[in-house]
Amino acid sequence: MKTEIKFDFEMVMGVVEYTRRLRFGGQKFSRAIMIEKAIEKTSKNLTYVGLDDTLGHDFTTKVNGEIWRLEAKGADHLFQTDRTFNTVKITLKNFQGNVNNNFPEKKFDEMILIDQTQRHIGIVSFEDALKNFDPKKNLKKSGLKIVVDKRDVEYIAKNVSLAPKNQVKELYHEIVDELYKWEDESDEW
């Protein structure tokens, strides 16, 4: 791991738990943004850029004077507990029908992996995340799905406790207010 990841794991896992009801269909996108914003708000060194879809990563930080790009991915039971060495399938990119057979362009340097049920957080390099990439297996019309070999993951937190609910609730409402702030104070349309 080249990046030192600094954010409040307990607060972020609290937001993961607090937003659990948003894990179906179109709500997943909103939940991901909430979790990513929680990482940003509790981070000492990560800048959130995830709302710009053209970038292909969620955070930036500086490592030895250069910009380092990080992608965040989370799922229930991400680090499966059965005998497999792989994570569950992770959607890396949604092509929405536009699939090419080339190796994915490098849009991030490291990936933050969040297991939302076991409450583990790990990090893996782009190269290790895609080392088993096979266009025939991984590219579908719905997007690019990968599995990461868990032996390549550096765990930065395991069995994370939840922050006190009142603190998590306060952070959650701060994020909602920021994301959905009503800009116009006038009563006129």
Predicted feature locations:
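Nucleic-acid endonuclease domains
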Residues: 1-189
